[in-house]
Curated annotation (Swiss-Prot):
NCBIfam families: 3a0501s007, PRK08568.1-5. Heterotrimeric complex composed of SEC61-alpha, SEC61-beta and SEC61-gamma. The chain crosses the membrane at residues 33-53, 76-96, 119-139, 146-166, 246-266, 362-382, 416-434, 441-458. It comes from Candida glabrata (strain ATCC 2001 / BCRC 20586 / JCM 3761 / NBRC 0622 / NRRL Y-65 / CBS 138). This is Protein transport protein SEC61 subunit alpha. Belongs to the SecY/SEC61-alpha family. The gene is SEC61. It is found in: Endoplasmic reticulum membrane. It comes from the Eukaryota. PANTHER family: SECY/SEC61-ALPHA FAMILY MEMBER. Keywords: Endoplasmic reticulum, Membrane, Protein transport, Translocation, Transmembrane, Transmembrane helix, Transport. InterPro entries: SecY/SEC61-alpha (IPR002208), SecY_CS (IPR030659), SecY_dom_sf (IPR023201), Translocon_Sec61/SecY_plug_dom (IPR019561). Residues 54-75, 140-145, 267-361, 435-440 are lumenal.
Length: 479
């Protein structure tokens, strides 16, 4: 059955653009150049406004997830990496439920699997672009006209396809790491930096204030006579970034770096060389930032579908159960879910909000921890890091677990790796919720994603660039 499903994508192989894998290893300096060029192209796409927009003043159901999805509203990067991540999530689900079985040992299966994911991402891009345009995000479709509506859809599809190819370029060995992680982490870092150091001023009702928390801190200390009151305002001002959020963000960043050094060291020995011993490390974050990326993609699709359905059928009881959307009382911000399933899946925002609605806090925490653990446990089967895959690597390299027989390697690894993956995913989820409670700049998930991606790039650079200084181990020792 699964073979027939994959074979359906065989005809697309002939005309679907593809990045050819390099015939030999790409030098480190060239990888840096390709990575920089890819990032530059992504940043440019995120600054080019869509041509043909009549109005972009409608509600934005994804405003708190845009940093996570590398999305900039009203630009070519409106959809960000959402279609690509969603496509990956769909195929992960199909594999995890055994509806689709792929032999990673088969070159043909791997190629068809990649083509299938790419086709799915293109279809999702078209669907999301169609929904965004036809629901009036850029003006009423009747005001836009058919030609402009089609042009907007084409622009969104073109930009998303460029991002898809850039990600493929990096993951196939021309650059460093994953394009999706790189683009998302860059967008998050840019967002955090802006909230901390933005020199723009806004009228908050207390007079003009600097938007950036650090700039506002020094400005308030300089102009206010009452320094104590100035400090309190700089650290706890509402509706604008404050210094407490900056400190919370730095704390979360350092704490995640500290946790990167946590690992279970599995003693192994060689069956080929007598007396040769080694350590096989199983990290706490065994699947890195993948669980939180997939969890964010799932949430974004739920919120998008919920708001679209509510706009069309606001009085339907089933739709209202899915989510009731409106502007939060006492604010003039974007529309948010006020009740329904979407409300309970929305990030908490702060410790105060968590205490005011403990039921939502419990449900949201359980949702994040559960989905992250599930995604992490499923991902190891797809990424080639499952107990079966590691046992195969051990056999090929002539390694066994110290004190265990060669025939029991898989059984021992099966006790450790799935548990480590699930626990690591749940830990990522717990850190995300904790960051939200602290009120860190951006969302907890975005800070975790940026930190793990930055550390991942550090590891890749250390490995390929020839320097071996272990920043995190040194940091862990200091702690």
């Amino acid at each position: 059955m699964s073979d027939r499903i994959l074979s359906l994508f065989k005809p697309f192989e002939a005309f679907l653009p593809e990045v050819i894998s390099p015939e030999r290893k790409v030098p480190y300096n060239q990888k840096l150049i390709w990575t920089g060029v890819s990032l530059l192209i992504f940043l440019v796409l995120g600054q080019i406004p869509l041509y043909g927009i009549v109005s972009a003043e409608t509600s934005d159901p994804l405003y708190w997830l845009r940093a996570m999805l590398a999305s900039n509203r009203g630009t070519l990067m409106e959809l960000g990496v959402s279609p690509i991540i969603t496509s990956s999530m769909i195929f992960q689900f199909l594999q995890g439920t055994q509806l689709l079985q792929v032999s990673l040992d088969s070159k043909e299966d791997r190629e068809l699997y990649q083509i299938a994911q790419k086709v799915c991402a293109i279809i999702l891009t078209f669907g999301q672009a169609l929904v965004v345009v036809m629901t009036g995000n850029y003006g009423s479709p009747s005001d836009l006209g058919i030609a402009i509506s089609l042009l907007l859809i084409f622009q969104l599809m073109f930009a998303s396809f460029i991002v898809l190819l850039l990600d493929e370029l990096l993951t196939k060995g021309y650059g460093l790491g994953s394009g999706i992680s790189l683009f998302t982490a860059t967008n998050i870092a840019e967002n955090i930096f802006w909230k901390a150091f933005a020199p723009t001023t806004v009228n908050s009702g207390r007079g003009k204030e600097f938007e950036g928390a650090v700039i506002a801190f020094f400005h308030l200390l300089a102009v206010r006579k009452d320094k104590k009151r100035a400090l309190v305002e700089a650290f706890y001002r509402e509706n604008l970034p404050n210094m407490f959020q900056v400190i919370a963000t730095v704390f979360v960043f350092l704490f995640v770096l500290y946790l990167q050094g946590f690992r279970y060291e599995l003693p192994v020995k060689s069956t080929k060389v007598r007396g040769q011993m080694a350590i096989y490390p199983i990290k706490l974050f065994y699947t890195s930032n993948t669980p939180i990326m997939l969890q964010s993609a799932l949430s974004s699709n739920i919120f998008l579908i919920s708001q679209i359905l509510f706009q069309k059928y606001p009085s339907n009881p089933v739709i209202r159960l899915f989510g009731v959307w409106g502007i939060r009382p006492g604010t003039n911000g974007p529309q948010v879910p006020l009740s329904g399933i979407s409300y309970y899946l929305q990030p908490i925002g702060s410790l105060k909000m968590a205490l005011l609605d403990p039921i939502k806090t419990v449900i949201y925490t359980a949702f994040v921890l559960g989905t992250c653990a599930l995604f992490s446990k499923t991902w190891i089967e797809i990424s080639g890091t499952s107990a079966k895959d590691v046992a195969k690597q051990f056999k090929e390299q002539g390694m066994v677990i110290n004190g265990k027989r060669e025939t029991s390697v898989y059984k021992e690894l099966k006790k450790i790796i799935p548990t480590a993956a699930a626990f690591g995913g749940a830990t990522i989820g717990a850190l995300s919720v904790g960051s939200d409670l602290l009120g860190a700049l951006g969302s907890g998930a975005s800070i975790l994603l940026a930190t793990t991606t930055i550390y991942g790039y550090y590891e890749v650079a250390a490995k390929e660039g020839g320097f071996t200084k272990n920043l995190v181990n040194g940091f862990s020792e200091m702690m």
